[in-house]
Amino acid sequence: MKIDIKFDGKPGYGVYINELKELKFDAKVAIVTNAKVGGLYLQNLLSRIDCPQKFIISVPDGEEYKNMQTIEAILEQLFVSRLDRSSVIIALGGGVVSDMAGFAASIFERGIKFINIPTTLLAQVDASVGGKTGVNNKFGKNLIGSFYQPSAVYCETGFLKTLEKREFAAGLAEAVKMAVTFDEKLFSWMQSANLTDEANLQNLIYRCVQIKAAAVEADEREKGVRAVLNYGHTFAHVIENETNYKKYLHGEAVSIGMNMANALAVKLGLMSEEQKARAAELLVKFGLPISYKVPNASSFYEAFFLDKKAENSAIKFILPRGIGAYEIRKDVPRELVMDVLREFE
């Protein structure tokens, strides 16, 4: 299965599902991975790569290591290995690995080719597609980075067989995000489908990539419709920052963030209580958290202004309109948001 992502005036790329065979290059290749993923899949990947020289760059595992210090370490190894502008970086791992490998590729000698091979469900349905790269800092999540498209993305469902249940569920949160905002039919299907079934899983990834591809093609740099893919993330990024990226996986924080956004949508009359309950039930069915004890509602609210989606001192909220549609709102009164946050205190 293949989905083509196309852009006006410049080359696009393919997202391949269960089609990873041999990769042939006429240049040096650096594979960025971590010890856990490398131990499982690195030898398998190396056997499929035909190139003059291969280098392995291992990065620490975890969102707390997604920072400029790790980027510096990656760049240093690229220089020591004497890679150049003809070289290729391959990201083998989840969203953290692809974010960092892509960012390093975008700034190494002003940009070299990179390929994503995502090994988590979250990365396959969302993070590896679309060219967002970057790292965190003390002010918030993904505040340093670039839009830099990969040359190809290879999603292999076989890589997901070793995922822990919690990691798998975190990926399903991003799929729920797309269903709630774009596709009511997908939402209803997810309510009843056995998503551990290989065929169902492949179909889920395919549909999510279709949704993401359409948004990216229409709005590569997130000025309009692509911002909808941040549904739940405005709240989630604050939660992750408040908990030092250690308590929740990204998808878990997004799950809580979607429930918070849904509560706000109900107050604005965009969503019924019954629809909010349906969304919450699906998240809980997948073993995802939907509640968070907000330490201080005022501080939480102020943290929104560090979000990349804030524009001209206005917070941009991505909110569901029922199930299967969305609204982007920049006019939500502070007190209405505070009411939601106080409900979670």
Placement of each model-derived feature along the sequence:
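ATP/NTP phosphate-donor binding region
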Residues: 1-88
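Glycine-rich beta-strand-to-loop/alpha-helix junction loops that act as flexible
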Residues: 61, 92-94, 231-232
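Short glycine/serine/threonine-rich phosphate/pyrophosphate-binding segments
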Residues: 96-102, 124-125, 238
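Active-site segments that bind and position negatively charged phosphate/pyrophosphate groups
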Residues: 188-298
